[in-house]
């Protein structure tokens, strides 16, 4: 009798079609032949992991990501001090491999994800990674992985928290603009300022319904936010003419729901909240 690895590829494909995401990942770890076979399979022949939310975090202690299947089912994978912890099991490896292992696992998860995510969140803390490598290499590795994936990630909401503006474009450009509804950008220390004009040129920005920026926005053309039905931004200053322009904008948008402008003062202090409803009333 032939062993499972000696079965014809068509038979193996049918076997995998009956398995769930975790079972295929387990099968992938059995031997190199299984791993290579699964890695070479067309994405359409892999089971859907059906996650609702994926959260990737890198800080001074670990790299981790959370996988939410439902409100009652949540899995956390953590990589720290040369080890990986998943469902109570720990695997040890060299310090230099922490980032590589984490990004490779993230690639596998996204490869299996066919259902549109409700939320994809990245959190990049400005700290040193094990081995002396700066953490800004994390979004670069992720960007390279997303490019290798050869398809855009489908999510309703993209959330990026960082103290460095560079990861935003590195991630944003690989999100499917047809699925994306809301962009959430935040500063971890509350001190970051970002020139937003380059982001506004992307299809993701142009097709999204909502934008929420938790940092000072520079070089903003107000016409670039007129299409949003929901918007929250922080500006250093705003003119009376610009305020009047924003006040009239909701009347031109049928599905407008919320607009908020926060004016910032020196030393990072916040001042003067300005909001408007769909009828242009402040």
PLM regions with names:
Residues 1-282:
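Non-core capping and flanking segments associated with repeat-based/extracellular domains
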């Amino acid at each position: 009798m032939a062993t499972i690895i000696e079965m014809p590829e068509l038979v193996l494909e049918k076997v995998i079609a009956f398995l769930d995401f975790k079972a295929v990942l387990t099968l992938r770890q059995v031997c190199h032949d299984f791993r290579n076979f699964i890695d070479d399979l067309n994405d359409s022949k892999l089971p859907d992991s059906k996650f609702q939310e994926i959260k990737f975090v890198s800080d001074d202690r670990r790299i981790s990501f959370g996988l939410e299947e439902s409100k009652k089912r949540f899995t956390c994978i953590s990589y720290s001090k040369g080890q990986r912890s998943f469902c109570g099991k720990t695997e040890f490896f060299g310090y230099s491999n922490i980032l590589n292992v984490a990004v490779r696992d993230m690639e596998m998860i996204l490869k299996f994800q066919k259902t549109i995510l409700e939320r994809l969140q990245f959190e990049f803390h400005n700290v040193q990674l094990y081995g002396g490598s700066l953490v800004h290499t994390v979004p670069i590795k992720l960007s390279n992985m997303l490019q290798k994936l050869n398809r855009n990630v489908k999510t309703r909401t993209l959330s990026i928290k960082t103290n460095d503006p560079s990861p935003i474009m590195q991630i944003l450009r690989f999100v499917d603009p047809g699925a994306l509804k809301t962009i959430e950008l935040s500063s971890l220390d509350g001190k970051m300022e970002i020139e937003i004009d380059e982001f506004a040129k992307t299809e993701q920005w142009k097709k999204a319904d909502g934008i929420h920026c938790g940092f000072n926005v520079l070089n903003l053309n107000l016409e670039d936010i007129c299409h949003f039905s929901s918007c929250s931004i922080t500006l250093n200053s705003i003119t009376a003419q610009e305020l009047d322009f924003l006040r009239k904008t909701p009347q031109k948008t049928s599905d407008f729901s919320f607009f908020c402008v926060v004016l910032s003062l020196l030393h990072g202090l916040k001042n003067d909240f300005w909001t408007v409803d769909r009828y242009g009333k402040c």
